[in-house]
């Protein structure tokens, strides 16, 4: 019932809900980034290491 939705905020503290939502989104963002860093295709930090190792191995 749309007209009675405001009563939800009488039960739940809006500050607590906003802090909880922000904390959850932060944890979710970190989780997604670490999952991507764990893959070979989407790891944006170690992109040049394999190419440098392959070049060094080919020159040796």
From Swiss-Prot:
It comes from the Bacteria. InterPro entries: Antenna_a/b, Antenna_alpha, Antenna_alpha_CS, Light-harvesting_complex. It is a single-pass type II membrane protein. Keywords: Antenna complex, Bacteriochlorophyll, Cell inner membrane, Cell membrane, Chlorophyll, Chromophore, Light-harvesting polypeptide, Magnesium, Membrane, Metal-binding, Transmembrane, Transmembrane helix. It is found in: Cell inner membrane. A bacteriochlorophyll binds at residue 33. GO terms for biological process: photosynthesis, light reaction. Pfam families: LHC. Belongs to the antenna complex alpha subunit family. Antenna complexes are light-harvesting systems, which transfer the excitation energy to the reaction centers. This is Light-harvesting polypeptide B-885 alpha-2 chain. It comes from Rhodocyclus tenuis. The lineage of its organism: Bacteria, Pseudomonadati, Pseudomonadota, Betaproteobacteria, Rhodocyclales.
């Amino acid at each position: 019932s749309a007209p009675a939705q405001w009563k939800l905020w009488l039960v739940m503290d809006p500050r607590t809900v906003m802090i909880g939502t922000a904390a959850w989104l932060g944890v979710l963002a970190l989780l997604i980034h670490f999952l991507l860093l764990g893959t070979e295709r989407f790891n944006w930090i170690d992109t040049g290491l394999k190419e440098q190792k392959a070049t060094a191995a080919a020159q040796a």
